[in-house]
Regions:
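Positively charged n-region of N-terminal signal peptides that target proteins for export
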Residues: 1-4
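Catalytic glycan-binding domains that act on GlcNAc-containing polysaccharides
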Residues: 42-199
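Short N-terminal segments immediately surrounding and downstream of signal-peptide cleavage
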Residues: 22-39
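Low-complexity, intrinsically disordered short peptide segments enriched in small/polar/basic residues
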Residues: 14-16, 29, 37, 121, ...
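Bacterial N-terminal signal peptides
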Residues: 7-15
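Boundary at the C-terminal end of the N-terminal hydrophobic targeting segment
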Residues: 16-22
Length: 199
């Protein structure tokens, strides 16, 4: 009786657990460290960048609808979506990919913490603050978390010459294991796919 109850409880709590792996500390060349530091230091207002205001409004309305079940507070949803679009575009990433990463990493929970200690929406490991940031950077702060997550993912995509599968494995600390990259790619291409302009 106890084992089935425990299994049911674990299954029910699965969406509350963060998938975040343990991003692995790797020494960075000074030029790479400098580039990533500049990316996470930006404090400009998170303004969405689209070819036209109408394109931006269509994207925001569609993503707002898709995210409603996961984040009931509309103001919080819109703030997250605007910041995702801004930080992803700055890092030359598809905002839809970033939404897929957030879904798998933290299930859209701002204060998620993995067993390895990764934090926030994009499950960033604290060592990155010492490596490329400043001591006051709070990884639970929306813009800070997204700036770090997008900069790190861009870095791994550059290392892997655009290979999403390998870059996502690096991001999660599970390079060579298929489960995490497949989960993110499925979320990106199925739940977050958007055929209109994303930036």
């Amino acid at each position: 009786m106890r084992a089935p109850l425990l299994s049911l409880l674990l299954f029910a709590c699965w969406p509350l657990m963060a998938f975040g792996g343990a991003q692995i500390y790797e020494p960075l060349a000074d030029s790479v460290r400098g580039r990533l530091s500049r990316m996470v230091a930006d404090r400009a207002p998170a303004t969405m960048h689209f070819r036209s205001a109408a394109d931006g409004q269509r994207w925001l309305a569609e993503m707002d609808k898709r995210l409603e079940r996961r984040i009931p507070d509309r103001q919080q949803r819109l703030e997250l979506l605007r910041a995702v679009q801004y930080e992803a575009t700055r890092a030359r990433l598809d905002p839809q990919l970033v939404l897929g990463v957030i879904e798998v990493e933290s299930a859209f929970r701002k204060y998620a913490v993995s067993r390895a200690g990764a934090r926030g929406y994009m499950q960033v490991m604290p060592f990155w603050v010492n490596l490329i940031g400043q001591p006051g950077h709070n990884l639970f702060h929306l813009r800070t978390n997204l700036a770090y997550g997008c900069a790190i993912l861009r870095h791994y995509l550059d290392i892997e010459n655009g290979d999403y599968f390998r870059a996502l494995g690096r991001y999660n600390g599970s390079l060579g294991q298929p489960q995490y990259p497949r989960s993110v790619l499925a979320a990106w291409k199925i739940r977050w796919k958007y055929d209109g302009p994303t930036g």
